[in-house]
Amino acid sequence: MQRTLANAKYLKERADRNSFEECLQYTASQFIIQKAGETRIKAGYHWYDSTTRDTFIALPGIALSGSTAKIFDEVLQSALKYCYNGRFARDISTHIVNPVFDADTSLWFFWTLQQYEKETTRTKKQIWKEYGETLKAILNAFKSPEHKTMRMDDNGLIWSDDLSRPLTWFNAESNYGAIVPRNGYVVEVNALWYNAICYALELAKDAKDKTFLSEWGTMPETIAESFNQIFWIESEKYLADYANHTHQNTEVRPNQLLACALDYLTLNEKRQRKVLAIITQELLTPKGLRSLSPESPRYEGESVGNVFVRDKATFNGSIHPWFVGFYVEANLKLFG
């Protein structure tokens, strides 16, 4: 009898799951957790904790789709506790004594706020008032000479280089460093960088922040020119995954998709079409985008074996569904 009553109470309190959309919303809500007095997004069950990159990428979908902005605000306020002098730590945890920082994480914060503005009634002026100091601190941190492994170069692009560990979402590593090294100018980092500066300028313009506009106003043009010069592979008609002063990595990977999907783009329409064409041809599957083209000699078609072998496959062929949203956005921009 007690079990029957308990089951009845559970069924009454359980969220509706009468449609695919309701099932998605219900499942997404399970990643919102309360821990250490904070509202966080769990990166994955069962062994992942909370990270800033995963939080910023997932938060709009989890907290703004069929939900209220209250959860969004709570998660952002919790994440802001882990922003140190303009850099978000990789991990959201009160137990981390020496936080580590990645090249792209802080830039995803700008993208998250862009989705926030689109889905709520918050104005640009309000967002700048509440988050402007953090946004300025992030941009200035990349300009600072203190951070040699992640810095703005003279050409306006972000140079990230650390032989001891990975600095992007390609985060598999061994005792010898990143399993898939990507040192130098990284394509999605710089696509996010351009988007971040353009969005900050738009907010600052609405808020009449003349000092910020004066300091950063000419940067988009410089970055766009450098981006096309550094990343565009003229012989192949797509973007390098990363590049340095003497070499372009020509492997076909999904990271270049962000250069076609964000709100502010450095590529003209013709180049966007070329990038989408190669992604569609070599990376698109019914489940998401491959992390590497099957045409590459490094392609791994299966994720089996020991930890090192599986980690290598994760970023050399395994499919990642999270790119699907950006693939759709890029196509909508071009084809409506």
Residue ranges and their predicted role:
Residues 1-336:
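Acidic, mature catalytic/reactive cores of soluble proteins
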